[in-house]
Amino acid sequence: MRGKTMGVKVKLLEYTPNPEKVVASAAKLCYSPVGVEEMAKDLSEEKVNKFLNMLMSYGHESPIEHVSFTFAAEGVSRSLTHQLVRHRIASYSQQSQRYVKLDQFQYIIPPEIDKDNNTRSIFIEAMENSQKAYDKIASTLEQKYISEGMKRKEAEKKAIEDARYVFPNACETKIIFTMNARTLMNFFRHRCCTRAQWEIRNLANEMLSEVKKVAPNLFKYSGPSCVNGNCPEGAMSCGKAAEMKKIYL
């Protein structure tokens, strides 16, 4: 059983080919009297960039829904994925604790806990106790089901699906998810914000870095809400809008 601090690992697995041209084509079609093929021939890289800038300035976001991005994330906690799936216009596939037996589960240690020896010791002890409880419950239930005539493989599966309830939010997990560009921009507004929790903020920043490599003009103004507008946090605002613009723009 090993703990991790801030070891989120994000990879952009797949994305719509030529995402910026696809978005520009969809947007231009709304205003063009010509056919799709003729319109596409006229879309040079320069015109694509110009059209994307115009779209963003107008707030015309529906065309950006035509492109999607698929990510894989590892080294993240269940606490993070509970927050992630609140962004509902997306598709998610997460490692199952019901079907995957965790003989030695890994866990995420929050940095504030990790840098204090006392709280770190308490935290690690709690993680170790969770593993011991899981092992004992799973073993006890498995033997019970076998004694009742159940086959071993089926008994193990049935046992771990209940034993998993003792695992904490810190339990490390892996997830693959797909979002369209409009959902991503909304995600970045909320999760790149300093008021988002540290772990999902780290994830959001890594994701933004990845999509900027393949669609730099599309995500040029992405980041927390204050980067390209007003802060919606009111009295809870961090007051760092100018600093955020320097970081993200």
Swiss-Prot record:
Residues given in the record as FAD binding sites: 62, 86-88, 94, 180-182, 186
Tell me the active site: 191 (involved in ionization of n3 of dump, leading to its activation)
| UniProt keyword terms in alphabetical order | FAD, Flavoprotein, Methyltransferase, NADP, Nucleotide biosynthesis, Transferase
Please give the positions of the paired cysteines in each disulfide bond.
none
What are the names of the required cofactors? Answer: FAD
Q: Where's the motif ThyX motif?
A: 86-96
Sites where the protein binds dUMP: 83-86, 94-98, 164, 191
Mind telling me which SUPFAM superfamilies this protein's record contains? Thymidylate synthase-complementing protein Thy1
Its pathway, per UniProt, is: Pyrimidine metabolism; dTTP biosynthesis
What domain of life does the UniProt record list for this protein's source?
Bacteria
Reaction catalysis annotation = dUMP + (6R)-5,10-methylene-5,6,7,8-tetrahydrofolate + NADPH + H(+) = dTMP + (6S)-5,6,7,8-tetrahydrofolate + NADP(+)
EC id: 2.1.1.148
- UniProt cofactor note: Binds 4 FAD per tetramer. Each FAD binding site is formed by three monomers.
Domain (ThyX): residue spans on this chain: 8-225
Give, as one word, the top-level EC class: transferase
CDD domains the record matches? ThyX
- Output the InterPro entries linked to this UniProt entry: Thymidylate_synthase_ThyX, Thymidylate_synthase_ThyX_sf
Looking up Pfam families in the UniProt record yields: Thy1
Statement: the UniProt record of this protein carries the keyword Methyltransferase: yes
Which is an annotated GO molecular function term of this record? thymidylate synthase activity
Give the family per the record: Belongs to the thymidylate synthase ThyX family.
Function text: Catalyzes the reductive methylation of 2'-deoxyuridine-5'-monophosphate (dUMP) to 2'-deoxythymidine-5'-monophosphate (dTMP) while utilizing 5,10-methylenetetrahydrofolate (mTHF) as the methyl donor, and NADPH and FADH(2) as the reductant.
**Self-association and partners:** Homotetramer.
Q: What is this protein called?
A: Flavin-dependent thymidylate synthase
Organism of origin is Clostridium tetani (strain Massachusetts / E88)
**Gene this protein is translated from:** thyX
